[in-house]
């Protein structure tokens, strides 16, 4: 039996979900909630499940030598082409790639209908690059960040006012590599008490804060894909259309790829569609 919450407070001056879908529950085993800092017993069990997840090994790069492009100058992680680093086509010349490191926060909470939901943002329409696109809170690592979890939660606090003390960081997924060679670490965190989170979007970066059901990224509904080519290799880029209230959002590229993987790990099943064309060459390990 799941605990019932009050309706999620309106994401102040932003968009929040009102249409919730009944979803298949993740395959989790009931465990003690003593190690989880608040929330329902189901979220505590989910936290225990995700803490046991170990990402597969990925290619190793020397982080001391970094490649930077104009795309990463702003330090933000937004929707763009991206792959799990372990399947990116780098075997042709792996020594060439020295990516910068970044982290994004996949912040999960339990919706009013018991479904798992993830917090997303829409970038400000005033930004010069990728304006109006959907992204996960996140950005580049700073020298004082002790780990990827700190990077992700620090950026979330800066962008949407999410107090890090409300988030229980439970695991990190394997790195993703953006089109412009930014190594992105997805960090999964669980929002302990959604009623304590009152989003305060940074007006210089964020236009809206909203949430979506995590399971939608495993379904072949409101989704389309497009074949493209990168570095001589073909791949699929995914687009998810999502409507909440009177707002329509499109979640695509790197953000969609990360959420597909996060949903697969959380629900312990693959998506109901082909993720990408099986033509990638694996990097040397």
UniProtKB/Swiss-Prot annotation:
Its cofactor is Mg(2+); Mn(2+). Its EC number is 3.6.1.-. It is found in: Mitochondrion. It is an enzyme of class 3 (hydrolase). Coenzyme A diphosphatase which mediates the cleavage of oxidized CoA. Can use malonyl-CoA, hexanoyl-CoA, lauroyl-CoA, myristoyl-CoA and palmitoyl-CoA as substrates, but not isobutyryl-CoA or propionyl-CoA. Residues 1-23 form a transit peptide. Pfam families: NUDIX (PF00293). Disruption phenotype: No visible phenotype under normal growth conditions. It comes from the Eukaryota. The keyword Acetylation applies. Keywords: Acetylation, Hydrolase, Magnesium, Manganese, Metal-binding, Mitochondrion, Transit peptide. GO terms for cellular component: mitochondrion. GO terms for biological process: coenzyme A biosynthetic process; nucleoside phosphate metabolic process; succinyl-CoA metabolic process. Expressed in roots, leaves, stems and inflorescences. Residues 51-72, 129-152 are annotated as: Disordered. Signal peptide: none annotated. Its main location: mitochondrion. One of its GO terms (molecular function) is coenzyme A diphosphatase activity. Belongs to the Nudix hydrolase family. Gene3D superfamilies: Nucleoside Triphosphate Pyrophosphohydrolase (3.90.79.10). Mg(2+) binds at residues 155, 159. The modification N-acetylmethionine is found at residue 24. The gene is NUDT15. A motif (Nudix box) lies at residues 140-161. This is Nudix hydrolase 15, mitochondrial.
């Amino acid at each position: 039996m799941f605990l019932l919450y009050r309706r999620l407070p309106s994401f102040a001056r932003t968009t929040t979900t009102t249409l919730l879908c009944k979803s298949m529950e993740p395959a989790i085993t009931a465990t003690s909630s003593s190690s989880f800092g608040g929330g329902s017993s189901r979220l505590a069990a989910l936290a225990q499940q995700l803490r046991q997840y170990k990402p597969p090994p990925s290619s190793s790069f020397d982080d001391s030598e970094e490649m930077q492009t104009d795309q990463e100058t702003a330090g933000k992680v937004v929707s763009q082409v991206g792959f799990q680093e372990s399947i990116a086509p780098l075997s042709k010349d792996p020594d060439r790639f020295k990516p910068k490191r970044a982290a994004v926060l996949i912040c999960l909470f339990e919706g009013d209908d018991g479904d798992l939901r993830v917090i997303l943002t829409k970038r400000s329409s005033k930004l010069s690059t990728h304006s109006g696109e959907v992204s996960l809170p996140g950005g580049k690592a700073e020298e004082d960040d002790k780990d990827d979890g700190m990077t992700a939660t620090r950026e979330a606090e800066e962008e949407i006012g999410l107090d890090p003390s409300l988030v229980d960081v439970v695991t990190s997924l394997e790195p993703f590599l953006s089109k412009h060679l930014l190594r992105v670490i997805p960090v999964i965190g669980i929002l302990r008490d959604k009623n304590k989170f009152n989003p305060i979007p940074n007006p210089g970066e964020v236009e809206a804060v909203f949430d979506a059901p995590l399971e939608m990224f495993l379904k072949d509904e409101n989704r389309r894909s497009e074949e493209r080519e990168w570095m001589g290799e073909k791949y699929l880029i995914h687009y998810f259309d999502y409507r909440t209230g009177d707002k329509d959002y499109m979640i695509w590229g790197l953000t969609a790829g990360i959420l597909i993987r996060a949903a697969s790990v959380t629900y312990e099943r693959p998506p109901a569609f082909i993720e990408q064309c099986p033509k990638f060459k694996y990097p040397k390990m």
